[in-house]
Structures are given as structure tokens and as C-alpha cells.
Design a protein with these regions (language model features):
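Conserved ATP/PPi-binding loop(s) of AMP-dependent carboxylate-activating enzymes
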Residues: 71-75, 86-117, 153-155
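Hydrophobic alpha-helical segments, especially N-terminal targeting/anchoring helices
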Residues: 81-82, 118, 126, 132
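Short, P/G- and charge-enriched loop/turn segments at secondary-structure junctions
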Residues: 62-69, 116
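Gly/Ser/Thr-rich phosphate-binding loop
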Residues: 2-65, 77, 84-87
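Active-site phosphate/pyrophosphate- and oxyanion-stabilizing loops and adjacent acidic/basic residues
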Residues: 33, 67, 112, 162
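Acidic-histidine catalytic/liganding microenvironments
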Residues: 4, 121, 167-168
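Glycine-centered tight turns that cap/initiate beta-strands
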Residues: 16, 75, 169-172
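AMP-binding/adenylate-forming catalytic core of the ANL superfamily
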Residues: 48, 87, 98-100, 105-106, ...
Length: 177
């Protein structure tokens, strides 16, 4: 939509729009800024899983922390751990875990998958890697299964894709290793 000519975009009155939800993966910062400039402060960032729990960022909070997928919903909790389950400090990427006291789930017919994605404290993970900032806003790096390790360094394809997508001559990109 952003590639539409300005005269086409200006033909449409979007002033009545109150809310638009962006979900599934973090929106590239440049794309989100341009959409907010066009549509106004109506685009909310949303991150969640069917299993329960999630985050949300209203437009003003996203502008304060570009790239965030938000803070935990009321009554939900987030934590970031290393591969051994130890909590990581603010700003340190690790496995994202969520907890929603009012929700529970299991993978139908797959107790071992259910068990490996839950911890003793009732948190679950879908395998995303991210970090929390000092104000509790979650930033996603990538899915752990997509991470590339080269020379002992963790490389997140989504970060590279975001940088490449910022170039005006690029319409879409996929990075894999």
C-alpha cells in the first residue's frame, strides 16, 4: 500500500478509521512510521499466541519505543530466559516466555511438546527470541528455529530483512542460512 502513488493515497479518506491492528511479526520501523503518517495514530501493535498471554502497544507507546510489540496485557506476565531457563537481564535477548493465569492449554495428542514448551512456573513459549527494555516493552528478534549461528554469533534473519526492506528499491526479502 505504501508503494501507491501519493495521488492515489490521497483519494481515500481514512479519518474515520479508529483502530487497525498489526500482528504476526513486528512491523519494520520505517514501514510502521510511514503508515502512521498516512493513517494517523490508529495502528496498534499486537503480539500473542493461541496458547494464552500476549502484549499490546498503542500508537503513542510504539512511537516512544519504535519496534516494540508492546507490554504484557493486564494479568499476563513475560520473562526472557537463556537456554537453561535462567532469567536474563533487561536488554539481553533470549527465549520469550508468557504466562496468563486464566489460560491453560496443551498440544492435542502431543504431551511431550506441551511439556517442553512449559516451565514449572506456568510460563509457556512458542520459541520466539526477544528482550525486554527497562520499561517492560518487548522487542522480538526472531524465531529461535530461524536463528543462524556463525562463528559463535547469533544472527537473526528478521533483523537483516528489516534493514534490507528499508531500502526504497526493495519490495520484499527473505534471509536464510
Amino acid at each position: 500500500m505504501l508503494q501507491l502513488p501519493d495521488d492515489v493515497k490521497q483519494k481515500y479518506d481514512v479519518s474515520a478509521m479508529k483502530y487497525a491492528i498489526h500482528a504476526a511479526a513486528p512491523c519494520p520501523v520505517d514501514v510502521k512510521r510511514r503508515m502512521l503518517e498516512w493513517w494517523g495514530p490508529v495502528i496498534w501493535e499486537y503480539y500473542a499466541a493461541t496458547e494464552g498471554g500476549g502484549t499490546i502497544a498503542p500508537p503513542d507507546e510504539w512511537l516512544k519505543y519504535p519496534g516494540t510489540v508492546g507490554r504484557a496485557w493486564p494479568s499476563a506476565e513475560l520473562k526472557i530466559t537463556d537456554d537453561d531457563g535462567n532469567r536474563l537481564p533487561t536488554g539481553e535477548p533470549g527465549v520469550v516466555w508468557m504466562k496468563m493465569p486464566t489460560a491453560s492449554f496443551e498440544y492435542k495428542g502431543d504431551k511431550s511438546k506441551t511439556d517442553e514448551n512449559h516451565d514449572a512456573d506456568g510460563f509457556f513459549t512458542v520459541g520466539d527470541v526477544g528482550y525486554l527494555n527497562a520499561d517492560g516493552f518487548l522487542f522480538l528478534c526472531d524465531r529461535k528455529s530461524d536463528m543462524i549461528i556463525a562463528g559463535g554469533v547469533n544472527i537473526y534473519p528478521a533483523e537483516i530483512e528489516g534493514e534490507i526492506l528499508a531500502h526504497p528499491g526493495v519490495g520484499d526479502v527473505a534471509v536464510f542460512g
